[in-house]
Amino acid sequence: MLTAALAELRGMGIEKVFVNGDATSEARPAEVRRFAEIMNTFGAPERQWFVTRGNHDRPHKPDADSSAGYDEFPVLEGTEDHRDPFGVLLGRPRQELWVTQQGPVRVIGLDSSKLVESGGEISPGQFDALEQELQRDPNKPTVVLAHHPITSEAGWTNAAGPIFILNSADARRLQQLLNDAPGVFFAGAGHTHRAKRTRGDFGAGVDYLETGACKAYPGGYTLLHVYSGGYQVNFHRLSSEDALAWTARARWAMYGFEPEALLGELSDRNYVVNRVIA
């Protein structure tokens, strides 16, 4: 699915790709290396492609899978015996943000993964770094990416409930930081596999979107086209024969309810927002 997505994006002339977490199944070293190998066919890391950490990419103890090779990596500082192939191999230390400038737009990637659970959190240190970055230029047009959704609406409407998203205290603090920076216009999430646009808990300046999964149903990618008068969001289903066959098979997960739970409304997948971006 990832190979098919990159081929389509390359054919469309897309120059930058952002993978918003869950790049692997369980962050096994072989999985991380294979992900990087596939992505490097598109371009150079930190230049043509960027990745945040999802819950599946979190550190693991060697006894989680004795044959995976976790024990070849050093013990993660501050943990009993967790190893972090994702962080080591991709140069993404746990709970550290990254920033890249794409034309007039600043893109900030957050690590919202917990050490051992599927829900999300943001460390005090990462919050401090985010606040400093936003305050450095609060009016700069900014996109923020984090694997876990952060709105109450996202928590109460996803199948697993509020425990599945960013914890409530961190979600409130993150929304406040984004709301206090007038340049932040878009906050993208993954995790739920669905296409779903939700309202923030306060303020109306930030657009919160969960994008549909690539690896399974609904099987696609989301394009964000930013221009001086606003931006356009479009979800594209993968069109290769193998990708369509897998998507058709994957739609029967969740007892056949995946289309109802994950595809979302047309307005969740395709829309335009008019605002000044300069």
Residue locations for each model-derived region?
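A short C-terminal boundary segment appended to hydrolase-like catalytic domains
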Residues: 227-278
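Short catalytic/ligand-binding loop motif for oxyanion handling, primarily in non-cytosolic enzymes
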Residues: 25-28, 58-62, 116-118, 151-154, ...
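His/acidic metal-ligating clusters that form di-metal
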Residues: 7-16, 101, 106-108, 117-207, ...
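Extended active-site neighborhood of metal-dependent phosphoesterases/phosphodiesterases
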Residues: 29, 33-136, 165, 169, ...
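Active-site/pore-lining binding-face segments in mid-to-C-terminal subdomains
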Residues: 183-186, 190-242
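Active-site glycine-centered loops adjacent to acidic/histidine catalytic or metal-binding residues
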Residues: 21-22, 54-55, 147, 190-191
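N-terminal active-site segment of His-dependent metallophosphoesterases
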Residues: 1-29
